[in-house]
Amino acid sequence: MGKHSATLCGLLVVVLCLASSLAQAQILFQGFNWESWKTQGGWYKFMQGKVEEIASTGATHVWLPPPSQSVSPEGYLPGQLYNLNSKYGSGADLKSLIQAFRGKNISCVADIVINHRCADKKDGRGVYCIFEGGTSDNRLDWGPDEICSDDTKYSNGRGHRDTGGGFDAAPDIDHLNPRVQRELSAWLNWLKTDLGFDGWRLDFAKGYSAAMAKIYVDNSKPAFVVGELYDRDRQLLANWVRGVGGPATAFDFPTKGVLQEAVQGDLGRMRGSDGKAPGMIGWMPEKTVTFIDNHDTGSTQRLWPFPSDKVMQGYAYILTHPGIPCIFYDHVFDWKLKQEITALATVRSRNGIHPGSTLDILKAEGDLYVAKIGGKVITKIGSRYNIGDNVIPSGFKIAAKGNNYCVWEKSGL
């Protein structure tokens, strides 16, 4: 091999290694809460002033609220999908915000609500089942043929039976309908090409089958996908991820459930009978998004909140462990935890912790959990101060600490 060829090969190896590292170093940031739509002047404009701070947390992706016109102000009862004038701001405001995040090398993830949809008009029978897409042509202008025939609240539907769970607040859309598949796929691609979105968060993904989600993912080719399957059964989540394929991941509700109970004096639960983590990260860490709270479980809804005095123990866990961690807006800005969260995220980045990093659980007892991640980081959570001799090897130094948590990293990095 010639000198120049060897040099080129060496450079190629370096570039490929860097690309692989960047692809693995992912932190998702949820950029809204349940009350964000109430912000005076619009949430999108308000968020322009937060881009720099969000970037400083180490976030690589930001999850934004549902983009379309909606009957509910929060965006989860969408109607005219192409109409981007919502309670969060205008389409122009949204596009400008996405560009601002892109300027900081942060990819934007759209909250995609396609299980159900609200109609604009009644038909001749007086039933709300006539949809308008928000354009001057007939794209997404649907009727009873596009509603599931077994919808319990809108039984006037003439489509196929639902492929997933029902949703009472709005008509369930027939995802087996070729027109629905074609036009929703076109809309998703429009969100990518016209707005600049790079990925999808699939709302209420239990409402339609993984096979249907796969169609939209395959047709729109997002770089990032995470499904919301509000369930503690990790087998259900694993089956969905495998069924969708490609870049699909799922929010790790099993880990949230176990962790928020374990930090209250039952940390022995953080090691399963197989010696691995008990949540989805114990099975498919590269396909898992871990989180502490979101706009449903926390915020003002508080449907399933993490213990408020132990939130930072939760972040010490997810930000140093396998999986893709998700940081919640409220904790950074409303709870004033930005400094502590950023310190943990920095440890993650500096040590190259990625979704598939190795996890060696050293201790999992009532008031103590200790684990080594990627061979470079050791994390302790729990109230016990004395963790025992020889647990922390020589050559490790404290990198981040707070109330009942501490993180060490190898010296000399």
From Swiss-Prot:
It comes from the Eukaryota. The keyword Metal-binding applies. Its EC number is 3.2.1.1. InterPro entries: A-amylase_bs_C, A-amylase_pln, Alpha_amylase, Glyco_hydro_13_cat_dom, Glyco_hydro_b, Glycoside_hydrolase_SF. Keywords: Calcium, Carbohydrate metabolism, Germination, Glycosidase, Hydrolase, Metal-binding, Signal. The record marks D296 as: Transition state stabilizer. It catalyses: Endohydrolysis of (1->4)-alpha-D-glucosidic linkages in polysaccharides containing three or more (1->4)-alpha-linked D-glucose units. Its cofactor is Ca(2+). GO terms for biological process: starch catabolic process; sucrose catabolic process. Substrate binds at residues 76-77, 201-206, 235, 276, 282-284, 295, 301, 380, 385-387, 408. Ca(2+) 1 binds at N115, D162, D172, G207. CDD domains: AmyAc_arch_bac_plant_AmyA. Ca(2+) 3 binds at D151, F167, A170, D172. Belongs to the glycosyl hydrolase 13 family. Binds starch not only at the active site, but also via accessory binding sites on the protein surface that are important for efficient binding to starch granules and thereby increase enzyme activity. PANTHER family: ALPHA-AMYLASE (PTHR43447). This is Alpha-amylase AMY3. It comes from Triticum aestivum (Wheat).
